[in-house]
Amino acid sequence: MSEYSLFTSESVSEGHPDKIADQISDAVLDAIITQDKYARVACETLVKTGVAIIAGEVTTSAWVDLEELVRKVIIDIGYNSSDVGFDGATCAVMNIIGKQSVDIAQGVDRSKPEDQGAGDQGLMFGYASNETDVLMPAPICFSHRLVERQAEARKSGLLPWLRPDAKSQVTCRYENGKVVGIDAVVLSTQHNPEVSQKDLQEAVMELIVKHTLPAELLHKDTQYHINPTGNFIIGGPVGDCGLTGRKIIVDSYGGMARHGGGAFSGKDPSKVDRSAAYAGRYVAKNIVAAGLAERCEIQVSYAIGVAQPTSISINTFGTGKVSDDKIIQLVRECFDLRPYAITKMLDLLHPMYQETAAYGHFGRTPQQKTVGDDTFTTFTWERTDRAQSLRDAAGL
């Protein structure tokens, strides 16, 4: 972090319109994968006043009641009444999903699964840093926790006048690559009309901001901006149109690392936009957990229909205990980054994706989950189970 003395990241709640779209797209993916693990899914969603539109390309033997599924996601988020401007029970649901192009399929599918080609060309990044216990940048971690707490306070009834839409932003101060303070906090939350701004700001400060952020990082000069424009009654898809894939920096590292541009939600693991980004995080996190570097960014790239990455690059920003070239060699020895191998390595053919679609895909805790007869582990790319083998291979 020597490049910046201040760094800011933002997050958005599950009720933000773009996140509604992401969650619907991943709910569709999960529902299909539950029945057909090898389905090809690319699902895009648009939400606006009174309507949810799902589109994209799917090749599967599964049958899913997509209208019912879309409505359930919207209602579970908290849009269950016209009073909040959007109601999953009464909104229109349009389904214009088609089939995957045969041209793409012939480039991806192989008789030997391990030779499966990448679903598209592209470049993906993974990142890890030792500045937090989850090996993620602090500004995005704190931003996620604020909007998670907003949803918790809303759903539990602690602050019943909160509505689903919210955004957060945190500015951290760094010295010698370590976080030494939080200089600014922004939290905008949708709310019912009857609550006063004074009551809202006091409650949000005490029960969300101070409850969530480390007290030792807050100081007398920290700036707090809670609903700085005043009223935030109109929100969600009424206030703004929501689209899948428009929060890719929120989904990843909050701007601290580079991004290849490909979104995650609605894409099955054959799409390297998603699976290779997850693999990149897995590699970078294990490198940092192994003590090979304090910070690590990895770039991988692919050509459509080709299994092997076209490049693997590493940058440890001068924090490496061994050279970046040596780490690249270790990565090639310890990780198979072909698309099929990534799917096997991270056990990605399970309905684990809707949970990733709010509050970040990285820095989360792997947990065992059961859907029907399928028991699996979520967020497998957050494991550090290869750190010791990397240390041994590096001679540390």
Swiss-Prot record:
Record text on cofactor binding: Binds 2 divalent ions per subunit. Binds 1 potassium ion per subunit.
Region (Flexible loop): 100-110
Pfam name, any one: S-AdoMet_synt_M
Binding site for ATP: H16, D165, A166, K167, D240, R246, K247, A263, K267
Cellular component annotations (GO), alphabetically ordered: cytoplasm
Binding positions (K(+)): E44
The keyword Ribonucleoprotein belongs to this UniProt entry's keyword annotation: no
Pathway connected to this protein: Amino-acid biosynthesis; S-adenosyl-L-methionine biosynthesis; S-adenosyl-L-methionine from L-methionine: step 1/1
Major subcellular site: cytoplasm
Catalytic EC class: transferase
GO terms under biological process: one-carbon metabolic process; S-adenosylmethionine biosynthetic process
SUPFAM superfamilies, per the entry: S-adenosylmethionine synthetase (SSF55973)
Subcellular location per the Swiss-Prot or TrEMBL entry: Cytoplasm
GO molecular function, a single term: magnesium ion binding
Entry superkingdom: Bacteria
Catalytic activity: L-methionine + ATP + H2O = S-adenosyl-L-methionine + phosphate + diphosphate
EC number: 2.5.1.6
Keywords: ATP-binding, Cytoplasm, Magnesium, Metal-binding, Nucleotide-binding, One-carbon metabolism, Potassium, Transferase
Needed cofactors: Mg(2+); K(+)
Chain positions recorded as Mg(2+) binding sites: D18
Amino-acid positions noted as binding L-methionine in the UniProt annotation, renumbered to this chain: E57, Q100, D240, K271
Family according to the record: Belongs to the AdoMet synthase family.
Oligomeric and partner information: Homotetramer; dimer of dimers.
Name listed for the protein in its UniProt record: S-adenosylmethionine synthase
Species this protein is from: Pseudomonas putida (strain W619)
Classification lineage: Bacteria, Pseudomonadati, Pseudomonadota, Gammaproteobacteria, Pseudomonadales
